[in-house]
Amino acid sequence: RFAGLQLTAQYSFKTDSKDDASFKDGAQHYSGDEGTSHAQRYASIGLSGEYGPASFAVGYELTKYGVNEATMADGNDGYGRQMDKDGQLVFLGGSYDFEVVQVFAEAQYFKHQTAAGGYELGSTDFGPVRVDPTDPSNSIGGSLGLKGYGLHLGAAAPLGAGTLTAGLYYVDFSEEFTEEPDADAKYYGVSARYNYPLSERTSLYAGAGYGQTKDDDTGNKDQLTQVYCGLVHTF
């Protein structure tokens, strides 16, 4: 840390040590041996700073997709690399404490991702269905991944003896294909959470959230509502 700034760098030789490069449970897996180019790898670098009531963070993330090495019973080889392009994401965010309320904001841009806005590659819920005739469970073929941007705006304010935190989320993205039109979709989300301290080390919390992903072309929607509560104790 220097002059309020902190630089952070990360690298993973395999993002999931328990994953492999086989065909099992009705799905392809795309992560070979750790330390090889067949494993899914991850790297990131970020810069953050704190200056009184203001703070910020900016960063870049890179995903090197792995390879499926499975040999099918009929002699067909595995499906190769999950995606030919590397996944990339950049983000910029910050917060400011106005004493009566703390405001948060973040924006990000991404491309060649496998998931965004509640949608995952291979899902048949949005856009045209792309199915591999040799394996109906594999509908990723020909995809260049998800591309788009996301925005987040949130705030935290004291309420009674506790703190209320709320947030709004928006993602505009599309799944790009090599030989077919893009499948466009949008995600909208809202959440709220209340934290009530029982002591210096123990607190109760309760919250709720709602999210909706909508396909622009077909109008199909996928909605999720959640309500939760719990207790936190710090030892």
Please report, for each region that a protein language model flagged, where it lies by residue:
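Detector for outer-membrane/organellar transmembrane beta-barrel domains
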Residues: 44-189
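C-terminal closing repeat unit and adjoining cap/tail of repeat-based domains
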Residues: 190-209
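Outer-membrane beta-barrel "beta-signal"
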Residues: 223-235
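Outer membrane beta-barrel
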Residues: 1-18, 39, 47-55
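Extracytoplasmic/periplasmic mature domains of Sec-exported, cell-envelope-associated bacterial proteins
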Residues: 88, 212, 224-225
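Surface-exposed loop and membrane-interface regions of Gram-negative outer-membrane beta-barrel proteins
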Residues: 14-39, 65-82, 115, 174-176, ...
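Short loop/turn motifs that connect adjacent beta-strands in outer-membrane beta-barrel proteins
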Residues: 1-4, 53, 160-161, 198-201
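Transmembrane beta-strands of outer-membrane beta-barrel proteins
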Residues: 8-12, 57-61, 106-108, 167-169, ...
